[in-house]
């Protein structure tokens, strides 16, 4: 953990150094007034069937699951978030957000904390972020507390981004606006994402809205006899163990029409062998392609495709201990209806295990469908109803969980999302 405090401390000192000259001239209300704070409380009720949720140590794909084949009902404060977003000047601002999530391993934990810079209005603009942040991947999250915008549960793609792809980064972006279109390039170097790939390999894909935190950890399902002597039963996604910096890059194109597309590349450059407390850095690389289009005045389409590879362990004559290719995609349609918004989404996901399948089979494939309706009750409250069904095949369920490889789950949720 020393690496976390050292890196975070250096980042905080750098941020304060940049912000200090402008703090004195900033309006107090812009830094400490009501407009400098945001908050969200999510009151949740749900009914779910099928296998035990992965959050409770099973192989279930959803936030909630059944119990011994029976459906279970839940009512809880699913999350409570507070964000401080000081505006030091036109060019310089910040964001610090903390969260409490039901079942979170730490009571209250850090969500994001970064300093932002933007240049003045011009055809070519520059911006930068430095601190703890999610890379610009998800088309489904927005806001100072990184909330899902159209549904309760994000896609498999962005569920994974939320649980394993948070970083401590220095990010820069250049954007040029032409007469009828915009082109932007983003690049960053980062640390503190050495464990990305652990959940994806040993649990597989999932669909849920639980986000990783700086000091938190997630449980893993039952591990095989060949893996359990070397892998802890938990994973700490934000750990930094190998001292290596990774990178990511993105290109965005806002076309002349109501369509935007982007392409993203990520490589954490993990060394695969520097084990600490039975957790080893993974070498995880992936691409993400995204698109968004307005289909008339009231309908929006979103899509993402993510594919890559993750590795852990030394080279052996028989391959690398964990070597999996992964891919997932979704298509989402959202339309304004009856004063609210109805959203339908289809998901597909797959994991292909390239090594030691006889002793540790991490193959998986599946699909999911989601239907949600979001209705504003007041300026500060939204009601959301969501029905989600997922079917998946994972052979490890038979050998490690004593259940059938093919499983399906259905989850009905209602959310009262309060903002302040």
Region roles according to the model:
Residues 8-20:
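Bacterial N-terminal signal peptides
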Residues 20-71, 193-224, 237, 381:
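Outer-membrane beta-barrel biogenesis signature
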Residues 69-77, 105-109, 159-166, 239-243, ...:
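Short sequence motifs at beta-strands and strand-loop junctions characteristic
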Residues 114-117, 141, 258-420:
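Outer-membrane beta-barrel pore domains
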Residues 34-37, 42-50, 69-205, 252-256, ...:
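Outer membrane beta-barrel
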Residues 1-4:
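Positively charged n-region of N-terminal signal peptides that target proteins for export
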Residues 62-67, 97-98, 151-156, 229-236, ...:
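Extracytoplasmic loops and strand-loop junctions of Gram-negative outer membrane beta-barrel proteins
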Residues 118-128, 163-331:
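Signature for the C-terminal beta-barrel architecture of outer-membrane proteins
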């Amino acid at each position: 953990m020393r690496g976390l405090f050292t890196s975070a401390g250096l980042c905080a000192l750098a941020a304060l150094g940049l912000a200090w000259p402008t703090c004195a001239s900033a309006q107090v209300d812009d830094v400490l007034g009501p407009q400098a704070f945001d908050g969200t409380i999510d009151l949740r009720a749900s009914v779910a069937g099928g296998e035990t949720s992965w959050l409770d140590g099973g192989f279930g794909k959803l936030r909630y699951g059944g119990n011994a084949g029976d459906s279970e009902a839940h009512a809880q404060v699913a999350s409570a978030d507070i964000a401080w977003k000081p505006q030091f000047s036109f060019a310089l601002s910040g964001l610090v957000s903390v969260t409490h999530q039901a079942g979170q391993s730490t009571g209250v934990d850090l969500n994001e904390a970064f300093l932002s810079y933007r240049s003045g209005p011009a055809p070519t603009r520059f911006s930068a972020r430095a601190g703890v942040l999610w890379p610009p991947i998800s088309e489904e999250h927005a806001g100072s507390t990184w909330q899902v915008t159209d549904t309760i549960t994000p896609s498999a793609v962005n569920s994974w981004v939320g649980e394993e792809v948070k970083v401590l980064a220095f990010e820069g972006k250049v954007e040029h606006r032409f007469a009828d279109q915009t082109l932007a390039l983003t690049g960053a170097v980062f640390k503190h994402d050495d464990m990305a790939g652990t959940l994806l390999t040993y649990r597989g894909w999932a669909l849920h809205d639980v986000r990783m935190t700086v000091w938190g950890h997630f449980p893993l399902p039952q591990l095989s006899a060949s893996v359990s002597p070397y892998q802890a039963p938990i994973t700490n996604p934000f750990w930094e163990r190998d001292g290596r910096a990774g990178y990511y890059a993105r290109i965005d194109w806002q076309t002349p029409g109501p369509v935007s597309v982007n392409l993203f590349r990520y490589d954490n450059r993990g060394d695969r062998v520097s084990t600490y407390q039975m957790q080893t850095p993974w070498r995880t690389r992936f691409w993400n392609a995204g698109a968004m289009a307005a289909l008339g005045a009231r309908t929006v389409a979103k899509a993402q495709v993510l594919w890559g590879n993750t590795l852990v362990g030394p080279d052996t004559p028989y391959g690398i201990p964990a070597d999996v290719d992964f891919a997932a995609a979704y298509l989402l349609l959202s339309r304004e209806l009856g004063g609210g918004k109805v959203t339908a989404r289809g998901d597909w996901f797959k994991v292909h295990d390239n090594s030691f399948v006889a002793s540790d089979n991490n193959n998986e494939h599946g699909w999911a469908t989601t239907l949600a309706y979001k209705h504003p009750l007041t300026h500060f409250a939204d009601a959301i109803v969501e029905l989600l069904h997922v079917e998946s095949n994972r052979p490890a369920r038979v050998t490690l969980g004593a259940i059938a490889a093919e499983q399906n789950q259905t989850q009905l949720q209602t959310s009262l999302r309060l903002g302040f």
